[in-house]
Amino acid sequence: MATYYSNDFRSGLKIMLDGEPYAVESSEFVKPGKGQAFARVKLRRLLTGTRVEKTFKSTDSAEGADVVDMNLTYLYNDGEFWHFMNNETFEQLSADAKAIGDNAKWLLDQAECIVTLWNGQPISVTPPNFVELEIVDTDPGLKGDTAGTGGKPATLSTGAVVKVPLFVQIGEVIKVDTRSGEYVSRVK
């Protein structure tokens, strides 16, 4: 794998630190008036998704991580594992609850997901940026009820709970941003 010096760190770069893969989220190279230059780097730990901030000297280096992002189709959940298929080779991969995390509530059958593999094993699953889900439960919107400026909670077909505007009713399909978990619009 390639070696990267701290001044080469860019957003999206995947590196190895302490034997684990990390993704660089942002990097700021600082040259103080006195002393050695350094890089202030925000990293995301790929195994757990936690964010860390580290400082690297300009002479520090890190190995590139042997991490692969693949576009796979979500097939089904058997209760313990979530199964995905490569559309080109028809090879199937299984991801456990640790790799899926909170993204399980956004997975729909036949959805294209980005699965990150490390040493051939899935370590994270990223659902599509937007999904269209049906509302299965929400409070009825009363005519003239505009006292609150917010919205109301709605339970979606996958079990996710999203705050929606007062005019949205049970049975309607809505578009949700999976990155923030927020309502975007109604689907006609």
Swiss-Prot record:
Deleted gene: phenotype: Cells lacking EF-P display highly pleiotropic phenotypes similar to those lacking EmpA or EmpB. They exhibit reduced growth rates, and they display increased susceptibility to hypoosmotic conditions, antibiotics, and detergents and enhanced resistance to the compound S-nitrosoglutathione. The susceptibility phenotypes are largely explained by the enhanced membrane permeability of the efp mutant. Analysis of the membrane proteomes of wild-type and efp mutant strains reveals few changes, including the prominent overexpression of a single porin, KdgM (STM1131), in the efp mutant outer membrane.
Involved pathway(s): Protein biosynthesis; polypeptide chain elongation
Location in the cell: Cytoplasm
Entry-annotated residues carrying N6-(3,6-diaminohexanoyl)-5-hydroxylysine: K34
Similarity comment text for this entry: Belongs to the elongation factor P family.
Alphabetized InterPro entries for the sequence: Elong-fact-P_C (IPR015365), NA-bd_OB-fold (IPR012340), Rib_uL2_dom2 (IPR014722), Transl_elong_fac_P/YeiP (IPR020599), Transl_elong_KOW-like (IPR013185), Transl_elong_P/YeiP_cen (IPR001059), Transl_elong_P/YeiP_CS (IPR013852), Transl_elongation_fac_P (IPR011768)
Main location: cytoplasm
Gene this protein is translated from: efp
PTM (free text): Is beta-lysylated on the epsilon-amino group of Lys-34 by the combined action of EpmA and EpmB, and then hydroxylated on the C5 position of the same residue by EpmC. Lysylation is critical for the stimulatory effect of EF-P on peptide-bond formation. The lysylation moiety would extend toward the peptidyltransferase center and stabilize the terminal 3-CCA end of the tRNA. The hydroxylation of the C5 position on Lys-34 would allow additional potential stabilizing hydrogen-bond interactions with the P-tRNA.
Gene3D superfamilies referenced in this protein's UniProt entry, alphabetically: 2.30.30.30, Nucleic acid-binding proteins (2.40.50.140)
GO CC annotations on file: cytoplasm; cytosol
Record-given protein name: Elongation factor P
Superkingdom assignment: Bacteria
An MF annotation (GO) of this entry: translation elongation factor activity
SUPFAM superfamilies listed in its UniProt record: Nucleic acid-binding proteins (SSF50249), Translation proteins SH3-like domain (SSF50104)
